[in-house]
Curated annotation (Swiss-Prot):
Family: Belongs to the FGAMS family.
Organism: Pyrobaculum aerophilum (strain ATCC 51768 / DSM 7523 / JCM 9630 / CIP 104966 / NBRC 100827 / IM2)
Cellular component per GO, a single term: cytoplasm
Active site: 34, 80 (proton acceptor)
Descriptive protein name: Phosphoribosylformylglycinamidine synthase subunit PurL
Catalytic activity, as annotated: N(2)-formyl-N(1)-(5-phospho-beta-D-ribosyl)glycinamide + L-glutamine + ATP + H2O = 2-formamido-N(1)-(5-O-phospho-beta-D-ribosyl)acetamidine + L-glutamate + ADP + phosphate + H(+)
Amino acid sequence: MALSPGELELIRSALGREPTEVEYALFRSHWSEHCSYKSTRMWLRRLPSKAPWVVRGPGTDAPLVEIAEGLYATFKIESHNHPSAVDPYNGAATGVGGIIRDILTVGARPIALLVNLHFGPPSHPHARWIAVNVIRGISDYGNRVGVPVVGGETWFHEDFTYTPIVLATCVGIVEKDGVPPGGAEPGDLIIVAGLGADKSGLGGSAFASKTLSEEAEEDLGAVQVADPLMGKKLIDLVREARSCVKFIKDLGGGGLATALAELAEWFQLGVVAELDKIHMADREMGPAEVLTSETQERMVFVTSPSKLECLERLLEKFEVPYSIVGRFTAEGRVVLKWRGEVVGDLPLSLVAKAPETPWPQEPYAPPPLPHVPEPPIEKAIDAVLSSPNVAFKQAIYERFDFDVGVRTVLKPGEGDAAVLKIYERGNLGLAVKGDANPRFTYLNPRLGAANAFIKAYRNVAVVGGRPLAAVDSINVGSPSRPSAYWQFVEAVEGLREAAEALGVPIVGGKVSLYNEYKGKPVAPTVAVVVLGVVEDVSKVNKAVWKEGDGVYVWGVTKDEVGGSEYLHRVHGLVAGQPPSIDYSVEKELAAVVRKWAGRLTGAKDVGLGGLAAALAKMAAASGIGADIDICKAPSTTARLDYLLFSESNGRFIAAGEEGPGTRVGAAGGDYFTLRCGSTIVYKRKVEELAELMSLKI
């Protein structure tokens, strides 16, 4: 994507001349939407990011959150939507590789991956091809570098048939004294380590800053190629190199162009780079191509001349190719050389930030919720439970190695969030979960984004975690489309409101624009990943019950079926408003779960598919039936279908000898039975239920 006429004029005016080919390439990459956030950063600054436990927030490759004395967690989310649409395998694999390298930049050990995936209907051949290969790419890369994929979420929606939303989150831990010190001074060296530069991924950031067309093959060259073997070498290298370096940076989107510009800006120093010194896999490359190549599995290390030998020794030990490509200066300019000749000389003040570009906004009104007839309840329950969105996702996560690293306490499907043991601090654990609901954010972007936040918050709370911090990913269409830009702005406001109300700072995130196919934008998708601390992993809650347990519902069900799975699956409607949020109730819910820690057999959040889906999932996961009087659940609705399928917030199910909330029945036997008083409204064998709720892909 070319620079805009206004941007070109700004560059010419500042330089007093035409930019050189290499300078133009730098601006084209670094000022792309993908790298510069020029259309979004003025809004993202509104998000709360500070708290006493936040050591480092947004602005660098990875944040740091203190989880225990002298121990930090880091987590980061990344989107790889455009590459995954064109080359699903490599698009997904390189997304995983890139997010792992972000975590490495703070010296952390990557301990887990989560994926939030949004595909077209599994019955559609093209959507299925994308889904199968995205899953394969994630699995192959994660398994080969030894980082477990421990959880996530998968959505199916017609809008994602040709334009998937593929999000990867990596979690890492690092001791306080293991974080590179940061800082740089004139004379410090810039080293590029990893694969040799080649033409794979050329223009990747510009590619991610435009919409997709039917001629996707022409963009294949903009998709990077993954190399998990080198990715594993970089993980091992960073583990030992922390004492040899001052600063580490991923060499990702925008290539060396963005890396050099960001390093110069962070340290407010000039840079001199000799582009011909970089090691190349393709010796036919010119300086502009070297500068903007997005070859994967590469990192930048900043070190002092006195520590160079220390770093070189480790690079050779792990057989990682490297080049000394530049140094910092006091001049405040970015100088680029090729075979001794200056091919670019730019003031840092011009390079650092693309001019902000706000766009017009245009609100829209979603379809109001019409009166819908009450359907045959048994058929409606079967329809909701068999929905690909509600179904168990074994067909996906069984392809992942979720046990490698032996930290996984709650595996995919066992609870509402993944739980990881932090052996470095006894029984301490981390709980982490990502959530999104594209229907909610279509109907009301602000309330939908807040719902994504509260759902992830509640999932972490229900397994026994204390939510600490969040990262987000906002995925919408072209910012030049007023309705899409309005969706983005409203989503930011929803995230801000939720973060402030819950006291959970947003420490990082990712915005992906231009998610369109043939001029049609996807449903706006806002994913939120919440990370929390579990004080004792032996007391976490699985989403199960045992024979003889009482079953309890905490929280009130309201007439809230707007945007629900029930409304879509049974009535074919996407209409109304997402569920309302009472943040005081959500915080009370989190406190109640922690109060009951170690005394429950299990617990589960009530969300997608309502009480019917949550109760059925606990039965199927346990392999044990239950007899539930659904009409005993606290509610303000007079309709049985709304009671069963409302997706009201502020609710969870508990199982145990005793439990919080209202007792609605007991677990036991081979049948899952729902009744209203003496009237049975649904009855199925548990083994039939498990089959009904299994995803086929």
